[in-house]
Amino acid sequence: MTPILFVDRDGTLITEPADYQIDAYEKLRFVDHVIPAMLKLRDAGYQFVIVSNQDGLGSESYPRASFEGPNNLMLQIFASQGIEFRDVLIDCSWPADNAPTRKPGIGLMVPYLQDRSIDWARSAMVGDRITDIQFAHNLNIRGFQLRTDEFGGEWDWPGIAHELADAPRRAVVQRNTKETRIRVELDLDRVAEPKTATGLPFFDHMLEQIGKHGGFALEIRAEGDLHIDEHHTIEDTGLALGQALREALGNKRGIGRYGFDPESSPWRVAGDKAQHGFTLPMDETIASAALDFSGRPYFVFDGEFKRERVGDMPTELVPHFFRSICDASGLNLHLTVRGENDHHKVEACFKALARALRQAIRREGTALPTTKGAL
């Protein structure tokens, strides 16, 4: 899904003169820092749509020809710097007309409201007037009012770009069914001690490994029908955690995408250049996890357990938990474990996944790590 930045024109992209009409080339002047800020937002995956009220455009006092020359030059300058607008929406009514297409009305937005490819949660509106903020409120998106002497406001373009493009990757997922109530909170850009409470102490200990060794803040609270058995609690926790990972990663721009064993790993055979899963030992046990946030869920598990359960966690639910994460997050995971002690083997699986996640979620720029254009 694609986020859209709706932008006002006069006073937002270009400065607004005293007569409120940019009807001559000499009146055309860009707002400070607008181009580098929009380039940053473009690289973060945003598309741009101009939404502007132009009082009485086409009337004798404001001929369309006087408007189009400076407007076309503005668009050409933006295009020369790599900034293209998906659409330019102009309302030509007068304030007294109370037209539904005039901001803060959203009459011009009908085609966009019907477009299911838009990421409305990340979309926003930037303008210099309170009507722009009201327009954002009517669309149920975030609004940023640029700081001006005439209308106030608190934001400048660099701050808006930072807020939208560098926003922390957070998610809160609440999954409620007749069998369980699961709440997962995570922040992929903050390190904190994990907090877990599922009613299953050994499972809690394993979940803590994901946050601790994954290098991100993780909090999980679960209430399930443990009087029946552990299945629903463990399965639904995996589904909620997978959904939280998917939501926090967003469009996945800039992430490593893959988690695997680096060539410098001490566990590699000398001269081995092939890509392997992220491998780690735990006493006699060795586990390997290779993953890809491809958007196509797939899980392969290679390992066996001798015991029916470790602590309060049935060993048959270990691969099932990982499969649930994959299904909900769109993750491709290959997980292998060898050893003698089942406690070590289960814990090594969780730690291997966590270390592979740490590598895959790391930001390495702004590019989308695929040739398809979407993940």
Curated annotation (Swiss-Prot):
The active site is at residues 8, 10. Mg(2+) binds at residues 8, 10, 128. It catalyses: D-erythro-1-(imidazol-4-yl)glycerol 3-phosphate = 3-(imidazol-4-yl)-2-oxopropyl phosphate + H2O; L-histidinol phosphate + H2O = L-histidinol + phosphate. Residues 169-375 are annotated as: Imidazoleglycerol-phosphate dehydratase. Its EC number is 3.1.3.15, 4.2.1.19. In the N-terminal section; belongs to the histidinol-phosphatase family. This is Histidine biosynthesis bifunctional protein HisB. It comes from Xanthomonas euvesicatoria pv. vesicatoria (strain 85-10) (Xanthomonas campestris pv. vesicatoria). The gene is hisB.
